[in-house]
Amino acid sequence: MRVLGIETSCDETGIAVYDEYRGLLVHKVYSQGVLHSRYGGVVPELAARDHIRKVIPLIVGSLKQARLISSDIDAVAYTAGPGLIGALLVGASVACSLAYAWNVPVIGVHHMEAHLLTPMLNKKLIISNSTSFSDFIDVIDFPFIALLVSGGHTQLVMVKNIGEYKILGESVDDAVGEVFDKIAVFLGLGYPGGALLSEMAQVGIKGRYIFPKPMINKPGFNFSFSGLKTAVIRAIMSSSNDQQTRADIACGFERAVVETLSVKCYKALKQMKVKYLVISGGVSANTMLRSKLLKMMYSISGKLLCPELEFCTDNGAMVAYTGLIRLKAGLSNRDLSITVKPRWSLESLPSIF
């Protein structure tokens, strides 16, 4: 089976085709970063309009690159939520229209479940029947803890199986990726600037700026980054504008974030008595975070699974992949009514088993 995946939840238009046996056949991503950079953040109306302009050409180009025609596609998967409602509606409308025209089922995919499963993308999905997903056992054992870190979410999730999720903790205010981008703007790096901030931090002097590590000593697994954001912005506003000082602030900020995330992960792994950790989402590309978590997992004889760097940010490949899993589990839909969920809890998803 082959599934076309369509991702339009925020400011990336992602298209991909995933084959049950051959793996990922093609994937293309168009980022709206330049469009939104002048505003210092995503403008929802502009995002939706740009998806409208880009989604069809990307689909046509992807099918052409993979040497596929419409009859080669067995289902269409799209991001149904969570996300920006206007952006979501673009992908949903196109997906349902194609499913109707091609007479194939449609699958509305949860954006964060797709991120959660992204680290498995570099493996072919070998399915012996609708309830035997042997490849996942080869990659990582259930249960595991997932750290989902992106521009819109910061969550620690207990994963008992695909579709069986328990949110252990999440940010009570700003998502960590959002804070990275906001601090980057104040550092003069523009939007989106999270990756540039990390590059700047590499030449910063460790220890010159020490910022609070929010909620690491509090019970539970929730996060809070608004106080850290305020502390860093104040440091930027009160400091000299030289490049080294900016790099030192970036270094202190990044270290505070990474330490906070790693402490919460460690506590969750210990309390849940789990040895496997998955990280995904845009911030999972952060080199310092990967290194810190890798050392932590080695110290407890655990295993860390990360996405390939090109799949950390939003993309259609993760949507197609997740759609295929749910299609094989019999969870597709012939009802072509256009449905999106700007707010949608992982815990409400049905299990594939």
From Swiss-Prot:
Binding residue positions for Fe cation: H111, H115, D314
Superkingdom per UniProt: Bacteria
GO process terms (BP): tRNA threonylcarbamoyladenosine modification
An annotated Gene Ontology molecular function: iron ion binding
InterPro entries in UniProt: ATPase_NBD (IPR043129), Gcp-like_dom (IPR000905), KAE1/TsaD (IPR017861), Peptidase_M22_CS (IPR017860), TsaD (IPR022450)
Pfam families registered for this protein in UniProt: TsaD
Record's GO cellular component terms: cytoplasm
Compartments, as annotated in UniProt: Cytoplasm
UniProt cofactor(s): Fe(2+)
EC identifiers of the protein: 2.3.1.234
Keywords, in A-Z order: Acyltransferase, Cytoplasm, Iron, Metal-binding, Transferase, tRNA processing
Catalysed conversion reaction: L-threonylcarbamoyladenylate + adenosine(37) in tRNA = N(6)-L-threonylcarbamoyladenosine(37) in tRNA + AMP + H(+)
Cofactor, how bound (note): Binds 1 Fe(2+) ion per subunit.
Residues at which substrate binds: L148, V149, S150, G151, G152, D181, G194, N286
Signal peptide positions (record): none
Group of enzyme by EC: transferase
Function text: Required for the formation of a threonylcarbamoyl group on adenosine at position 37 (t(6)A37) in tRNAs that read codons beginning with adenine. Is involved in the transfer of the threonylcarbamoyl moiety of threonylcarbamoyl-AMP (TC-AMP) to the N6 group of A37, together with TsaE and TsaB. TsaD likely plays a direct catalytic role in this reaction.
Family the entry assigns: Belongs to the KAE1 / TsaD family.
Family matches, as NCBIfam families: gcp_kae1, T6A_TsaD_YgjD
Name of the protein this chain belongs to: tRNA N6-adenosine threonylcarbamoyltransferase
Gene: tsaD
